[in-house]
């Protein structure tokens, strides 16, 4: 893969660098001329990786504080049915860790780029804006809403994404679709306003380069995420 369009020479830490979003973000930022390191439970095939779990907050803190990063990208999350079955862990990963990262970098130049989800909204109202109060109903929805960082230094990006998994056994939509042998059912009168993981990586680099802060619904009707910021 070669997505390079001119480097920015920034230094990133991707927490959760082996996930569906994290590995594409890592590849894109590295190929675009940036210094990219990862934090995950296993080594990334693409970038240097600190082997650790987010439950090990001392190691995570040491990595972030000593790394002199321009931006730390938080890609970790406990999803849907896993959050429902492991509620205390879901609160820790989805709600606590983002604010922990913001707290330990408060007096540093490091920006936290936190990935949230459009699932903080139930979908009942439609046409949600950043000013709407999250009304998601599931435990996952609510823990992700609690984890959102809203301040004038860091940025939270609410996303709905699709992209390749790092493993063939991945459970993402694209992997599932590519494994089907027959026709698959679709939807009518529905609009999906999300983005690919590659487009998300471009959005993240733009936000990091210009130190954009706050809360953004990255639910796009165009392919240019930068215009939305």
Task: Give residue spans per PLM region.
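NAD(P)-cofactor binding segment of oxidoreductase domains
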Residues: 85-113
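Catalytic helix-loop patch of NAD(P)-dependent Rossmann-fold dehydrogenases
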Residues: 92, 96-100, 119-157, 161-166
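Single conserved hydrophobic/aromatic residue that forms the stacking wall/gate
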Residues: 221-229
